[in-house]
Amino acid sequence: MVAVVRSLMVLLLAQVLLEGATGLIPEVGRRRYSESGKQSPQQSEGFLNEFELRLLNMFGLKRRPTPSKQAVVPQYMVDLYRMHSANGDHSAKRPKSMGRHAERAASKANTIRSFHHEESMEALARLKGKTTQQFYFNLTSIPKEELITSAELRIYRDQVMGAASTNNSSTNSSTSDKAHAGGFHRINIYEIFGVPQGREPLARLLDTRLVQDSLTRWESFDVSSAVFQWTSGKGHNHGFMIEVLHPEEGEVEQERADKHSRHVRVSRSLHQDRDSWPQARPLLVTYGHDGRGDSVLHTREKRQAALRKQRRKHQHKASCKRHALYVDFSDVGWNEWIVAPPGYHAFYCQGECPFPLADHLNSTNHAIVQTLVNSVNSNIPRACCVPTDLSPISLLYLDEYEKVILKNYQDMVVEGCGCR
């Protein structure tokens, strides 16, 4: 029975999303279809596979993702999704993990992707007074038609042990410790554009930040120019170089230098961080637009207000109107790769378009003429009850490469119905 339910859910979802003929669905809410007239198991399996492929293609996927249990969804991506979900709610606060940059970037993008670096590429020689690391992010999964509008490199840094704010420093601390308390050091981000044999990489500075030792937080660096060059084919992706300049001048103790090196989480510590490292790894976030529809943070207040107005109208029971339809991703096994939401209210349109068409049926002039002709010639069909207003939803999911994506998909929710 479970297989039948899943099959019917796929058929229902396919009809809603692909055919656009939601008025043909004779069910309300989560009411299940009857099993009458169903195809043979072999036919149904092939039919469902074809529909699933079409749906995955609509999502920009070549095959159904099967992420491993070790796949990590960065908290930052979850925060971005929640910020989208609260869009239009003026009382909702922006999460602390993100700045204004993310909000501005998301307002211009309909696709947000996150990438972790390839750890085997990260080591570079340590130089006196600074720590240097190389990072390579594989961006080949970004489609060619997606234009990158912005990109940020996010680095997590811990408070340096003993570097609490000056106000909290012990009165018995040494002079050097007091000088160090609440100190600063600099993080530089470079684009590597050449790697000569046996020499230091050739690089250009992208962004820099003077950071305080006494704070634990994420730092965001603008790397848009480099990522745009790489994804547009105008430059070769050799990765980034991160340089941490320690505040001590001249001779420094190795222990003190190592402490500052660990302050910025640019590499995994041996035999440590097994649990914390996945959520503290450097993260590259790209913001792009494929030319289809609204941005992730596009407001829906106007449509929702129009919908509330439509609900208040008194409509005849059998006339064309919107009905409840909830799509549960767990029913079709898609909750394995769709992180959020667990499902959504798709709705559908059903009802009569009788002559004469009433004003609340949201009809076009053509539908009025067609219904008028039908009243004298039954060979001409009546106008049909169809969606007249559709809105997007955002999905947070893992693709076939286990990359975490937040994307806005158009025309997924019926907001209004009418006779057309």
Swiss-Prot record:
Coiled coil: none annotated. InterPro entries: Cystine-knot_cytokine (IPR029034), TGF-b_C (IPR001839), TGF-b_propeptide (IPR001111), TGF-beta-rel (IPR015615), TGFb_CS (IPR017948). Residues 1-23 form the signal peptide. Glycans are attached at residues 138, 167-168, 172, 362. Disulfide bonds join 320-385, 349-417, 353-419. Gene3D superfamilies: 2.60.120.970, Cystine-knot cytokines. Keywords: Chondrogenesis, Cleavage on pair of basic residues, Cytokine, Developmental protein, Differentiation, Disulfide bond, Glycoprotein, Growth factor, Osteogenesis, Secreted, Signal. One of its GO terms (biological process) is semicircular canal formation. Residues 24-303 form a propeptide. It holds the Pfam family TGF_beta. It is found in: Secreted. GO terms for cellular component: extracellular space. GO terms for molecular function: cytokine activity; growth factor activity; identical protein binding; protein heterodimerization activity. The keyword Membrane does not apply. Its main location: secreted. Induces cartilage and bone formation. Belongs to the TGF-beta family. Homodimer; disulfide-linked. This is Bone morphogenetic protein 2. It comes from Tetraodon nigroviridis. The lineage of its organism: Eukaryota, Metazoa, Chordata, Craniata, Vertebrata. The gene is bmp2.
